Amino acid sequence: MDSFNNSVFISLSGINTKILILGGGKGALTKTRTLLDSGFTVHCLSKEFDFKFKDLEQSYLNLKLIYKPFTEELLDEYHLIVICTSDDKFNNSIRSICNSKNKIFIDTTRPEDSKAVLCATRKSKNIALGLRIKGKNPKASVFLCNKGKEYLKEFDNYVEFITHIRNSVTNLNNKNEILNFICSEDFLFFFNKNYHSEILELFYPELIDN
Protein backbone atom coordinates (compact mmCIF):
# COMPACT_ATOMS: atom_id res chain seq x y z
CA MET A 1 0.00 0.00 0.00
CA ASP A 2 1.12 3.56 -0.67
CA SER A 3 -0.40 6.99 -0.11
CA PHE A 4 -0.60 7.78 -3.82
CA ASN A 5 -2.61 4.77 -4.96
CA ASN A 6 -4.62 4.44 -1.75
CA SER A 7 -6.17 7.89 -1.66
CA VAL A 8 -9.31 9.76 -2.68
CA PHE A 9 -9.86 13.43 -3.52
CA ILE A 10 -11.98 15.48 -1.09
CA SER A 11 -12.81 19.13 -1.74
CA LEU A 12 -12.43 20.99 1.56
CA SER A 13 -14.55 24.11 2.03
CA GLY A 14 -12.77 27.18 3.35
CA ILE A 15 -15.94 28.48 5.03
CA ASN A 16 -15.54 28.41 8.83
CA THR A 17 -12.58 26.02 8.53
CA LYS A 18 -9.55 26.71 10.77
CA ILE A 19 -6.08 25.57 9.78
CA LEU A 20 -2.91 25.60 11.87
CA ILE A 21 0.39 25.87 10.00
CA LEU A 22 3.50 24.96 11.97
CA GLY A 23 6.49 26.84 10.61
CA GLY A 24 7.39 30.30 9.40
CA GLY A 25 9.65 29.72 6.41
CA LYS A 26 9.13 29.91 2.65
CA GLY A 27 7.31 26.57 2.49
CA ALA A 28 4.87 27.69 5.17
CA LEU A 29 4.46 31.01 3.36
CA THR A 30 3.45 29.30 0.12
CA LYS A 31 0.89 27.07 1.83
CA THR A 32 -0.46 30.00 3.85
CA ARG A 33 -1.00 32.15 0.77
CA THR A 34 -2.76 29.31 -1.06
CA LEU A 35 -5.14 28.62 1.83
CA LEU A 36 -5.88 32.28 2.50
CA ASP A 37 -6.83 32.81 -1.13
CA SER A 38 -9.37 29.99 -0.76
CA GLY A 39 -11.05 31.60 2.25
CA PHE A 40 -9.66 29.47 5.08
CA THR A 41 -8.91 30.88 8.51
CA VAL A 42 -5.17 30.32 8.91
CA HIS A 43 -3.10 30.56 12.07
CA CYS A 44 0.68 30.15 11.77
CA LEU A 45 2.83 29.13 14.73
CA SER A 46 6.58 29.81 14.77
CA LYS A 47 9.28 31.49 16.83
CA GLU A 48 10.10 33.63 13.80
CA PHE A 49 8.56 34.27 10.39
CA ASP A 50 9.77 35.09 6.90
CA PHE A 51 9.39 38.87 6.44
CA LYS A 52 6.75 38.35 3.74
CA PHE A 53 4.35 37.02 6.39
CA LYS A 54 3.97 40.59 7.62
CA ASP A 55 2.68 41.66 4.23
CA LEU A 56 0.16 38.81 4.27
CA GLU A 57 -0.97 39.69 7.78
CA GLN A 58 -1.75 43.24 6.64
CA SER A 59 -3.66 42.00 3.58
CA TYR A 60 -5.73 39.17 5.07
CA LEU A 61 -8.03 39.44 8.07
CA ASN A 62 -8.24 35.62 8.18
CA LEU A 63 -4.53 35.26 9.06
CA LYS A 64 -3.04 35.23 12.55
CA LEU A 65 0.64 34.83 13.41
CA ILE A 66 1.33 33.06 16.71
CA TYR A 67 4.74 33.45 18.35
CA LYS A 68 4.10 31.39 21.47
CA PRO A 69 5.58 27.89 22.03
CA PHE A 70 3.71 24.85 20.73
CA THR A 71 1.45 22.91 23.09
CA GLU A 72 -0.41 19.71 22.31
CA GLU A 73 -3.74 21.20 23.37
CA LEU A 74 -3.41 23.81 20.63
CA LEU A 75 -4.20 21.20 17.98
CA ASP A 76 -7.72 20.73 19.34
CA GLU A 77 -8.75 24.16 18.03
CA TYR A 78 -8.18 23.33 14.35
CA HIS A 79 -9.70 21.20 11.61
CA LEU A 80 -6.44 20.66 9.72
CA ILE A 81 -2.77 20.77 10.70
CA VAL A 82 -0.01 21.61 8.20
CA ILE A 83 3.58 20.77 9.18
CA CYS A 84 6.19 22.99 7.51
CA THR A 85 9.28 22.92 9.75
CA SER A 86 12.79 21.59 9.10
CA ASP A 87 12.96 19.94 12.55
CA ASP A 88 12.52 16.22 11.82
CA LYS A 89 12.15 15.31 15.50
CA PHE A 90 9.44 17.93 16.01
CA ASN A 91 7.64 16.92 12.81
CA ASN A 92 7.64 13.28 13.85
CA SER A 93 6.21 14.23 17.23
CA ILE A 94 3.42 16.27 15.61
CA ARG A 95 2.53 13.38 13.30
CA SER A 96 2.27 11.04 16.30
CA ILE A 97 0.10 13.48 18.25
CA CYS A 98 -2.19 14.07 15.26
CA ASN A 99 -2.59 10.33 14.75
CA SER A 100 -3.48 9.85 18.41
CA LYS A 101 -6.11 12.60 18.15
CA ASN A 102 -7.43 11.42 14.75
CA LYS A 103 -6.47 14.80 13.30
CA ILE A 104 -6.09 15.26 9.56
CA PHE A 105 -2.59 16.59 8.90
CA ILE A 106 -0.33 17.49 5.99
CA ASP A 107 3.40 17.04 6.49
CA THR A 108 5.02 18.93 3.62
CA THR A 109 8.37 17.29 4.42
CA ARG A 110 7.01 13.73 4.29
CA PRO A 111 3.88 13.60 2.11
CA GLU A 112 4.03 9.81 2.11
CA ASP A 113 3.35 9.86 5.88
CA SER A 114 0.62 12.52 5.70
CA LYS A 115 -3.11 12.00 6.05
CA ALA A 116 -3.67 14.51 3.25
CA VAL A 117 -1.82 16.35 0.50
CA LEU A 118 -2.45 19.93 -0.61
CA CYS A 119 -2.92 19.46 -4.33
CA ALA A 120 -2.42 22.04 -7.05
CA THR A 121 -5.85 23.53 -7.74
CA ARG A 122 -7.29 25.77 -10.42
CA LYS A 123 -10.83 26.99 -11.07
CA SER A 124 -12.74 28.13 -14.11
CA LYS A 125 -16.28 29.52 -14.01
CA ASN A 126 -17.96 26.14 -13.40
CA ILE A 127 -15.16 23.62 -12.93
CA ALA A 128 -12.61 23.11 -10.14
CA LEU A 129 -9.56 20.95 -10.83
CA GLY A 130 -7.26 19.35 -8.28
CA LEU A 131 -4.09 17.62 -9.46
CA ARG A 132 -1.53 15.46 -7.69
CA ILE A 133 1.46 13.70 -9.17
CA LYS A 134 3.40 10.81 -7.70
CA GLY A 135 6.40 11.97 -5.71
CA LYS A 136 7.38 15.52 -4.73
CA ASN A 137 7.36 17.88 -7.71
CA PRO A 138 5.15 20.91 -6.98
CA LYS A 139 6.28 22.89 -10.03
CA ALA A 140 5.23 20.04 -12.32
CA SER A 141 1.87 19.85 -10.52
CA VAL A 142 1.24 23.56 -11.04
CA PHE A 143 2.35 23.41 -14.68
CA LEU A 144 0.04 20.49 -15.50
CA CYS A 145 -2.81 21.99 -13.48
CA ASN A 146 -2.58 25.20 -15.49
CA LYS A 147 -2.74 23.20 -18.72
CA GLY A 148 -5.72 21.27 -17.38
CA LYS A 149 -7.55 24.48 -16.52
CA GLU A 150 -7.08 25.87 -20.03
CA TYR A 151 -8.48 22.66 -21.47
CA LEU A 152 -11.46 22.48 -19.09
CA LYS A 153 -12.42 26.13 -19.68
CA GLU A 154 -13.68 25.00 -23.08
CA PHE A 155 -16.38 22.99 -21.28
CA ASP A 156 -17.61 25.76 -18.96
CA ASN A 157 -20.71 26.69 -20.96
CA TYR A 158 -21.53 23.04 -21.60
CA VAL A 159 -21.30 22.21 -17.88
CA GLU A 160 -23.48 25.19 -16.97
CA PHE A 161 -26.14 24.14 -19.48
CA ILE A 162 -26.30 20.44 -18.59
CA THR A 163 -26.29 21.26 -14.86
CA HIS A 164 -29.36 23.43 -15.43
CA ILE A 165 -30.99 20.50 -17.25
CA ARG A 166 -29.99 18.09 -14.51
CA ASN A 167 -31.58 20.27 -11.83
CA SER A 168 -34.81 20.54 -13.82
CA VAL A 169 -35.32 16.78 -14.33
CA THR A 170 -34.74 15.49 -10.79
CA ASN A 171 -38.40 14.44 -10.40
CA LEU A 172 -38.85 12.86 -13.83
CA ASN A 173 -39.08 9.10 -14.21
CA ASN A 174 -36.67 9.14 -17.15
CA LYS A 175 -34.11 11.31 -15.37
CA ASN A 176 -31.24 8.85 -15.80
CA GLU A 177 -32.00 8.42 -19.48
CA ILE A 178 -31.89 12.18 -20.01
CA LEU A 179 -28.68 12.58 -18.02
CA ASN A 180 -26.99 9.83 -20.01
CA PHE A 181 -28.13 11.58 -23.18
CA ILE A 182 -26.74 15.02 -22.32
CA CYS A 183 -23.55 13.67 -20.73
CA SER A 184 -22.28 12.12 -23.93
CA GLU A 185 -19.86 12.83 -26.74
CA ASP A 186 -22.74 13.08 -29.21
CA PHE A 187 -24.59 15.78 -27.28
CA LEU A 188 -21.34 17.64 -26.59
CA PHE A 189 -20.70 17.67 -30.34
CA PHE A 190 -24.07 19.27 -31.05
CA PHE A 191 -23.63 21.70 -28.15
CA ASN A 192 -20.36 22.92 -29.62
CA LYS A 193 -22.13 23.39 -32.96
CA ASN A 194 -24.86 25.37 -31.14
CA TYR A 195 -27.55 22.83 -32.07
CA HIS A 196 -28.16 21.55 -28.54
CA SER A 197 -31.62 23.13 -28.21
CA GLU A 198 -32.77 21.61 -31.48
CA ILE A 199 -31.51 18.18 -30.44
CA LEU A 200 -33.26 18.38 -27.08
CA GLU A 201 -36.47 19.52 -28.72
CA LEU A 202 -36.26 16.56 -31.07
CA PHE A 203 -35.79 13.92 -28.35
CA TYR A 204 -37.13 15.60 -25.20
CA PRO A 205 -39.40 18.50 -26.17
CA GLU A 206 -40.70 18.81 -22.61
CA LEU A 207 -37.29 20.12 -21.54
CA ILE A 208 -37.19 23.15 -23.81
CA ASP A 209 -39.57 25.17 -21.64
CA ASN A 210 -37.28 24.52 -18.66
Outline where the language-model segments fall.
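Glycine-rich adenosine-cofactor-binding loop
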Residues: 8-33, 46, 161-176
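An accessory alpha-helical subdomain
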Residues: 133-210
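Short beta-strand and adjoining strand-loop segment in the mid-core
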Residues: 39-43, 79-88, 127-136
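ADP-ribose/adenylate-binding Rossmann-like module
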Residues: 80-86, 91-117
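A short, basic/flexible loop-to-alpha-helix module at the beginning of a structural domain
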Residues: 1-14, 119
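Glycine-rich, highly charged phosphate/nucleotide-binding loops
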Residues: 58-73
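NAD(P)-binding Rossmann-fold cofactor-contacting core
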Residues: 30, 38-56
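E1/E1-like adenylate-forming module used to activate ubiquitin-like modifiers
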Residues: 102-156
